[in-house]
Structure formats: structure tokens, C-alpha cells
Amino acid sequence: MKFVIIYLLFSQMIFGQNFGQNKVQYNTFDWEYIVSPNFNVYYYGDNYDLAVFTSKVAEESLDQIGKHLRWRSNKPVKIIVYSSHNDFQQTNIVGAYMPEGVGGVTELYKNRIVIPFEGSYTQFKHVIHHELVHACINDMMYGGNAQGLISGRILLQIPLWANEGLAEFLSTDWDSETDMVVRDLAIEEQLPTINQLNYSILAYKGGNSVYQYITEKYGREKIGEIFQQMKRTQNAEKGFQNALGVDFEQLTKDWHDYLKKEYWSDINKREKITDFADKITDRTKTRNFYNVSPAFSPDGNTVAYFTDQNGYMDLVLHSLDSGKQKKRLIRGNTSPDFEELKWLQPGLSWSPDGKFIAFASKSGKEDSIIMVNTQNGDYDKIPIALDGVFTTVWHPIENKIAFIGHKDNASDLYIVDLDTQEVINLTNDTFSDFSPTWSDDGSRIVFSSDRGSSTGSPDMFNVDFSQRDLFMYDFAIEEIVQITDTPYNEDYPSLTKDNLLFYTADYNGVYNIFRHEMGSEIFSPITNAITGIQQIDVDSSGDKLVFSGYSERGWDLFVMSQAQNREKEVIPETRFYSERNDVDTFEDLRFVKTEKPNEESQDYSQYIFSRNYRRFNDTNKDDEQDPAPVSY
């Protein structure tokens, strides 16, 4: 599961404080920009190709957004691209601090989009599209300037759920993550009202679901009519009522009925996670949201994991023998070395002797690999000269750690020698890599990637990076071998001594655990969860499996026994997955059409992608701070 995407754009609502929220300017950026018909894309350093990718995605997204809103852009939008989240946190375009999890921001005074590239093209494309929806709504409803709204001259205030929900709906439509969140709400009978969506993180996934219902019942053409009516009446609810014929109270009832019909029939087809695994954390008692990134100790008696029980992301040890929390090793967000614990792309890993745990952390201006003593909490750190470091995994024999590193426009699989601190790039291409795990003898690394069957460093705009397969780096031949080749998402691999590979996949629309006998064609489901599973780890015996499971609006940890012997014959598809290839066409109702409505792709031959445009590099005028309202 692409966990980073689920909470990508709203996690800033969860954590009230972060260490060092006053911005520190570590770097001076020499900005350049490229020009396309509707965008000026600003970049720096060696990120010209990333800027071109951004411009192409933005132009493609703008046409889709305009078609839905029945609106056409008449002024260029500025997009400022940072090559890492660490650089993004230094921006002066908006004054707010950008903690881990804020994937992009739209500044509404000058209608500028600010986004970081964090190694995943899927995430990056989603954020471009999502933030552009905000910029388009701002231009359409407020003339591209929110001053009228703030001064009171404009009365219309678009509800958070209507704004963020549409941004999610248009940028992702519907996927396994959204389905998981909404399915859980329906099954647990915790569906909010339309108005209640404004006061929680459900404004994103819940709002998406409302638009999904509206377009299924009334057609996609209604989206543009809703916003046209909002603008005409200067009232959000009247906009919906005039377009749909129902007020928010009736819309809530209709939406709830739709979801109950959709999901309640699934209850007898699938299992609750507690039906096949033992829960070792309990969010209902600790009142937190995240318990993630579990990792077995070498003896299998302790599980290390990240948790936000105290409002910060901490590293905690849990004893399986006593069933209780043993100790809190690291308190995140409270010191310069633990500014952020990379909980969106986590990876905890024990040393072979069980004396240390490794993880990645933001430490000042750069990321580091931290190795903390499990007995006394002392730690060492190795600064890594990359744009981002994620998901560490300790070599089973040697003093080395594999990790995912992000540099410029790519994320790759790396190894660092802990004795010499030499860093080696193993994959070294443009594709995005994730979730490495070692084989028992250290001769192979299995990982997840969006590379498919492609090789080299192609133009990523023309690559289908929408899903991940599993791959293996074989040190004997120094080559990458593909393990899975499906149109689905495989992730979080974990290998046993017996050459069994466990991983998660959404083959049926729900993220479940699968088992694969390496070297064979046997792939077997071992769970049939009703919600979703991620971030798995198998103990040294290969018998116990720990994972993070989603239920009751959050993530808990579970341990499953006899993982080698479990098997499910059939796991039925969800409705959205069975209909995922259906094409939902609708009429383009914009008044002016300068392009063929059924064009398959955009012609970029007339675009100006010039390296000679510079934006006053010494003054950085476009990086001057405004006390501006923002939309995430």
C-alpha cells in the first residue's frame, strides 16, 4: 500500500507541534523557469527534467479539471518545485512550517503552487494535480486572489470537504486507499454527516466519496454545475441544492444509503483482522492514530515500531512475552537529530545481534541513518549526502545497511558500509524504489518499484508508474530480476530462511498478505481482510508475521501465527476493482474549445522549455514571503 499517499495531504492536521518550527534557511536557491501555455514552472539545480515533467502533468491535469468545472484558464499559474522535502521546508512563499506529510501547498494570494519531489512519481503527479484543483477553484471562484474573501467583499466560503474532496476525486478518482478508509467508516457505522466532514481528516477521503456518489447518480457534468451555482448564489449549500435538488441533510442521507449498500454486503465475504491475528496495540485505549513500521527482534520476542501515542512520532519496544510496552527508545520531533522520523516511508531494522535498531531521520539540513542502542538509548548517526533517506534494513551478516535514497529526480536502492561510511547506489536510474528486504544470506535484496519492464532512464511522463511490482537485486550477477508482473500494487516484501516471500498486494481491491515460493510460479493469498494491511515483517522462524492493519479509523499492530501454512482459496474483488476499467465519459460543456475533445495525448512540440529563463537568481524575488492563506 502506498501509505505515503493516503495521508500525504492532510497529516499536518494531526501533529500540533514540531521541533524547530521556525524556518532555518540552509540553502540559497538559484531559480530558473520553463514556460508552457498555462504554466511557469520554477526549478533549481539539475532538475530541468523534473520541471518539464511537472509542466506536462500540469497541462494534462488542467484540461481534465477545466472540463469538470466548465471553466478555462486565462492566466498562467506559477509552480515552484523543490527537489526534496528538506528544501521545501525552507520556502518563504508561505510562512507556515511544512512538517513531514505536507506534500504540497497552494498560496491563494498570488495563486502559486509549491511542491517538493520526494522520490515517488506517483505521489508527485498526484500532488501536482491535487494542488492545481485548488488553484483552479481559486481562479474560477475568487478571480485568482483570495483578498476579496478575506476582506468580506466575497461571501462564498467553499467547505473544506467540497474543496479537498474534489481535489482528491479529480487527482486520484478512486483507489484502494480511499476505498479502505470509506469501507471502514461504513462497516463500523461511523459515517459522518456532510457538515462533519469539515472538521476532520475525512474531508479528503470522505469528500472524495461524496463526489463519487454524486457523479454515479447525477453524472460528472454536475460538478461544474455545482460550482457555477455556488458562484452565482454565493452560498455553498445552495450551490449543491440548485444543482442536485437536495440540501446537505438529504445529501447526507442519500450518500450514507449508497455506502451501506456498497459495503454492508461485504461483511460476510471478508474477515475482520482480529479474526485471523492478535492485536498487540490498542488505539481505543491510547487514543492515537498511528502504530506503524513493526520489526521483529532477532529472537522474535520484541517488536519495535513507531507510534504517535504522545502526540509525537516515537520509537517504542513492545514485549510479546508480557504483552506490554517495554520502553520508549526515541522521542521524535524533540531534538535536532530526530526532527522527523520518516514515518510516511518508514523502516525499522534490528542489527543481527539485536543490540541496535536502525532508522532514517531528518537531522537538521540533511537526513541521517540513526543506530540506537536498544538497552540504554544511546545512538550514532551517519549523515547521508542525498536529498532524502528512507526505509533502512540491516544486512543479516555484514556491517552494512541497505536503504532507499532520493537524489534530484530519482529514488534508488543504496547500501552504506557502516565501517567506512561508503555509500553505493545499486539501481541508479530514474524509477522509484521502495521497501527493501535482505535474503537470509545477504546475497539478494527484494524491493518494490514502479519500473515495470522498463530499463534505463526514460522520459517518466511516458512511463506507466501507476503501480508497483516486486524486484530482486542479485549481487552475484549485479542485475535486477523481476519477481511479479501484474497491473496491481505489490509492496512490503519480507523473506524467510526457507525462501518464502511474504508481501502485500491489492489484487482484489483490498490490501492483503500473499506468500510466494521463490523460484516458483506459486502465489497464494493468506488473508482476506475487510479493510487493509501494510508494512509486514516475518520473524526468524518464518512462523510469526507482524503487520500494521487499518480498522476503526486508524492503524494498529497485529501478530499472525502459522504464516507458512495459511492459505485462502478465493478473495473476492471489491466492486470498484471489478469496474476499474470502465470508462466514465461525459460531455465537455466549456464554452470555448480550442482543442479536439477526444485527443489521446497533448502535443508539446510548441512548448518553450528554455534553460535561458532566469528569475533574478541573486534576489530570489519569487521566493519572498507573503502572509498568505494556503490550501493543502
Each model region followed by its residue ranges:
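Predominantly a core beta-strand signature of beta-propeller blades
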Residues: 275-281, 323-327, 377-381, 421-423, ...
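Outer-membrane beta-barrel initiation region
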Residues: 568-632
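Blade-terminus and WD-like Trp-Asp/Gly-His loop motifs, strongest in beta-propeller folds
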Residues: 294-302, 348-356, 392-400, 436-444, ...
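Juxtacatalytic substrate-recognition/specificity segment
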Residues: 16-159, 176-178, 195, 236-239
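A flexible loop/linker signature enriched in serine peptidases of the S9 family
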Residues: 180, 287-289, 306-316, 333-343, ...
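Active-site-proximal alpha-helical
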Residues: 65, 158-177, 184-246
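Sec-dependent N-terminal signal peptides
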Residues: 3-13
